[in-house]
Amino acid sequence: MGQKIHPTGFRLSVSRNWASRWYASNRDFAGMLAEDIKVREYLKAKLKNAAVSRILIERPAKNARITIFSARPGVVIGKKGEDIENLKKELATRLGVPVAVNIEEVRKPEIDAKLIADSITQQLEKRIMFRRAMKRAMQNAMRLGAQGIKIMSSGRLNGIEIARTEWYREGRVPLHTLRADIDYGTSEAKTTYGVIGVKVWVYKGDTLGRNDLPAAETPRPEEERRPRGPRRDGRPGDRAGAGRGGRRPMGTNAAPADGSDKPAGAGGDSVKRVKSAPAAAAADGKGE
């Protein structure tokens, strides 16, 4: 039974890039990775209402540069930039190095997998029917240019006693194609019945490299039937004239006109002898 690999990890260094871009020695690697995880958890809780899609962390030369991709950058910046200044101070205290914070706006949140999953979980927490939330998100994504989308919800859907999984798909979602730009996001809805998990796959088209350039579509060559090579027994390999409308070549292998088992050309001499023989000899031959 096939299982689904993580689409982002499957495409790293092919069509996707890492969310943490820095180099560290073996001694410092684990500590810096733990710092990145804590920073992401802090920003996720702090900017819960800012529609944060992803967080990019870079560490150039004893500094840190954090890029926040958000659909609502005004909420992150705050009035006159007060919130972002407080955010810089808090992050510098946690990391122990000077931190530069950049805000990038997500132009189309309707086709961002993480934002779609967060939107569905917020609706589930407000007791909206899960099918309605999923289908509405799929319609918005397809309307704004997504080539395919798949949404899966798991848990006690509608408060039923036994947990189950339901998923819907529209368009194409080629998970095995490495050049396919698959955006993947997850989220959890904490309801009174328990936790409901939501997974979203969005197919945005093919890419060339990590620059997210659309791949050039190569036209498929029309299927042409190639002529066969020479046969081992010396007969011609091309069957162009051997169809229903073609004529069979008259040779040693042609069928005889009288329907006998012998080839037509093999019994030419015997036919002449039968014609020149007297009638009595022919009758004796038939009796034998």
Curated annotation (Swiss-Prot):
* SUPFAM superfamilies in UniProt: Prokaryotic type KH domain (KH-domain type II), Ribosomal protein S3 C-terminal domain
Q: Where is the composition biased (Basic and acidic residues)?
A: 219-238
* Feature: compositional bias, Low complexity: 277-288
InterPro entries linked: KH_dom, KH_dom-like_a/b, KH_dom_type_2, KH_sf_prok-type, Ribosomal_S3_C_sf, Ribosomal_uS3_bac-typ, Ribosomal_uS3_C, Ribosomal_uS3_CS
> Which intervals of the chain are annotated as region Disordered?
209-288
Gene Ontology CC: cytosolic small ribosomal subunit
An annotated GO BP: translation
A GO molecular function annotation here is: structural constituent of ribosome
Q: Which residues cross the membrane?
A: none
Alphabetically list the UniProt keywords. Answer: Ribonucleoprotein, Ribosomal protein, RNA-binding, rRNA-binding
Which positions fall inside the KH type-2 domain? 39-107
> Where in this chain does the entry annotate a coiled-coil region?
none
Which region is the signal sequence?
none
Q: Which family does it belong to?
A: Belongs to the universal ribosomal protein uS3 family.
Q: Which HAMAP family match?
A: Ribosomal_uS3_B (MF_01309_B)
Q: How would you summarize the oligomeric state and partners of this protein?
A: Part of the 30S ribosomal subunit. Forms a tight complex with proteins S10 and S14.
Q: What name is this protein filed under?
A: Small ribosomal subunit protein uS3
In which organism is this protein found? Answer: Acidovorax sp. (strain JS42)
This protein's encoding gene: rpsC
